[in-house]
Amino acid sequence: EVDAISVWEPWGKVALNLGGANVEVLQAPRLYSQTFNLLARNDYKQAQAKRITSILMAIDDAVAFIKANPDEAKRILVRDAGVDPDVVDSVWPIYRFELSLQQSLLTTVQGQARWARREGHVPAELPDPEFLNNIDSSLLRKVKPNAVDFVFP
């Protein structure tokens, strides 16, 4: 028994179906923006640039496939993830399939850093992190030049 949950779709829809009339949805559009980020150590990126570039190209191809063939992409998701087709159809519109690096990522991690300091998870005497020193868009720019929407040093 729980008082509240916060989950990604399609599991929110599944919880609603299981909970019936006892479940209430608190709508908070754009309260949270879900991203999936690719991370690599700098030494790995330098040594494996070709491999990382291939991964980025494969993701871009997958995004193009999803956009060109949404019904088939949904069928694959249903088959491979075992999710009910009605659930997939109901949550599909909230997803944005894109290979990109956006200003919002930097804004989000900066906000998380401020929260961590404010809540005492980070010692106050530590300097603010320089996130731009840890973000490298060079390989993504080679694969998809328009995928990065802000200027990096």
Q: For each predicted feature, which ranges?
A:
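Residue-level "edge-of-site" marker
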Residues: 10, 28, 91, 105, ...
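Glycine-rich, flexible loop/turn motifs
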Residues: 34, 40, 93, 127-128
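Secondary-structure end/capping motifs
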Residues: 46-125
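Short secondary-structure boundary/hinge segments and terminal tails
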Residues: 15, 33-34, 95-96, 133-138
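Pocket-lining segment of extracytoplasmic ligand-binding domains
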Residues: 1-80
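Short, structured secondary-structure boundary patches
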Residues: 26-29, 43-48, 107-111, 140-150
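Conserved C-terminal helix/tail region of periplasmic/extracytoplasmic solute-binding proteins
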Residues: 117-153
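Helix N-cap / beta->alpha transition motif
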Residues: 27, 41, 102, 132-136
